[in-house]
Amino acid sequence: LTSHVTPPRYWLVMPAAGRGKRLGGATPKQFLTVAGRPLIAWALQPFFDDPRCAGVMLAVAPDDTDWLSFRASLPRPVLETSGGAERADSVRLALQALLARGAQAADWVLVHDAARPCVSNAEIKALVDAVVAHAEADLRAGGLLAVPLADTLKRGRSHSEATVPREGLWRALTPQMFRLGALLHALQQAESEGRKPTDEAQAMEWQGSEPLLVGGESTNIKVTTFADLRLVEGILQARSKGESP
C-alpha cells in the first residue's frame, strides 16, 4: 500500500457487509446478477478503470460465502476488512484499516455504495475535480454527488397534509469524497454520541462542514426493489451497446 496519495488520487471505500436479502432470497443484494455481472462488480468497475484510484478497501462480512466466491473473479487485488452492523460502522472500520496499512489522514477517500451499479466514469471525474478544486487548505473539505429534486413533494401519512417546496433540495448519491482523517473523526464522534449518520456527508455536517454538492446523473440509482433491478439492467445493457444513458 502506497504511504501517501497526492491529490487528486484517492482510495475507494465500499461498504459491502450488508445482508439485505429481500431481493434475492439467500443472496445479499450486492451479489445479485444484473446484465451478466453482480451489482458490486458493476459498482467497482469505473474505479478499477480510473488511474487516480490508488486502491480499494471493501468492508465485508467475514463469513459471507458470496463475497469469497466473488473475490476470486476480481480483475485486480483489493483490500478487505470486516464490516460492522451499520453502514457507518463499516465505513469507519474500513478507514481505520486503511490507516493501519499506511494511508495518511490527509489522503482523499471516496465512499461508494455496492448497490449503485450505474455510477459513471464522468461522475467520478466531476466529483474528484470539483472537490479538489475547492479544497484549498481545509481538511474538512469534501463533497458528494447529488441530483436536484424534480418531483413535487408532499408531507403526510395516508393523506397529503402539505406540499414541501423543493427549491434547494437535492437527492444525495454516492460516491462521497472527504479526507480520510476528517471523515474518520466525524464517524468516530458520531459513534461515541450514539448517532448513526445515513451517509458520510451527514457525519461531516455534524462537524460543521458544508460538503460541496456536485451534480450527478439520475441514472446513478441505488437498488432497493425489483423495479430498480429492471431499471439498472436496462441502463447497463444500453451502455454496453454504446447507447444512452
Listing of model-derived features with the role each one plays in the protein:
Residues A72-D107:
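Short phosphate-binding loop-to-helix
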Residues A105, V119-G215, P245:
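Conserved core of the sugar-phosphate nucleotidyltransferase
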Residues R87, A114-C118:
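Acidic metal-phosphate-binding loop of nucleotide-sugar-dependent transferases
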Residues L1-W11, D199-A201, S218-N220, D228-P245:
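SAM-dependent methyltransferases
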Residues M14, I40, A94, H112-D113, ...:
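Residue-level signal for inorganic ion chemistry
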Residues P7-T65:
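N-terminal glycine-rich phosphate-binding loop and ensuing alpha1 helix
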Residues H112-A115, T174:
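Short acidic donor-binding/metal-coordinating loop in glycosyltransferase active sites
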Residues R52-V56, R140-G142, T219-N220:
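Short active-site oxyanion
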